């Protein structure tokens, strides 16, 4: 599988290789975070009335959460990666 990359806003990059998600420039992360699907927890908040959405991903074995705040349009572009990550998490459990 090729690495997928999605630029979110003007400062956040999300990459996915089918096993590991990597987030650079997230709101609640220092630098970048790499999390393998086998130990990941994912939460997606759909856009609110103002069009603001959010996703968070963390290693289930620690409490450091990586939070990405984004627009509804960015969420739509990121949706294929998040759906694949959710499927990989479900398969790993």
Regions found by a protein language model. Name each.
Residues 1-10, 27-93:
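Acidic, Ser/Thr- and proline-rich intrinsically disordered linker/docking segments
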Residues 9-24:
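Polybasic phosphoinositide-binding surfaces of eukaryotic membrane-targeting domains
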